[in-house]
């Protein structure tokens, strides 16, 4: 929050603010939760950067807490829980998501919360927790459709891992019903608008998907976790796979299934799977705990390396540098560059519009290049 007022609105935020002024049951590119929270911010704070960004900041904090709690469910002690929380807090994608009010921060939290519930059920066998899982999944799908993919992948993973009994019971079915209830408004809106999201996804797949996207996707995954801790999530994937618990292995299956799906068929951006690294880091922290305990200095060195690599990430993903000096980070993180220059852009457009003769101005139509430009003008 200390940096929330620096630079300006991100183009996604400009779009969400406009969506908040015209609330609907859903939208072409995402469900209603993000615009709804933007609407709450408008009512409470007006058009305010800190007021809009308080929600993703809170979501990021809760995701860090969830990372530590997931490690506890996997059997980790305080050291593993601390490492999991630190690993989550230093994820570049979470640092960036905490600063921009779009769907990403809430998506990270929802996935982490559902993984926490699944990990707990896998450890305790208490199926009543599926009710909480359904609520989490429902809120997640109200934010972003990716939660549907994650939930389905978990079910497939459970079946592949021999966990049919754990997902075929009345508590799971009740939880699934809760999740579906949250999805009904979105489905109703999509049906009324010729399934616009599916059409958009197909267009993205044609533009960015297929085999040509695999290389970019694989390399991009290396940047989801701070570089010094990248090997920890790999250890976590191995830990889950060898755990012997069907639901824990299902979480590993979900990662693998979605990795392939997003890489090959959806033209997905590299951060679409970022939320999975929260639970993989938590599992990895548990997996390497004995190794860290053998030599106390190892944890200190690991945290020092994480601090150094995170410092570099902070310069790239957060508005720390003067706005005039962010050009060198733009290729790595164009999102930060998209928070600069909107006020000048609007003044330029306004000046041109006002320079028109009154009769021409009355019928003039302004065409923009993207939703960010449109949102800036409408704001």
Give names to the regions the model predicted:
Residues 72, 114-130, 236-243:
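Membrane-interface transmembrane helices that cradle and orient dolichyl/undecaprenyl
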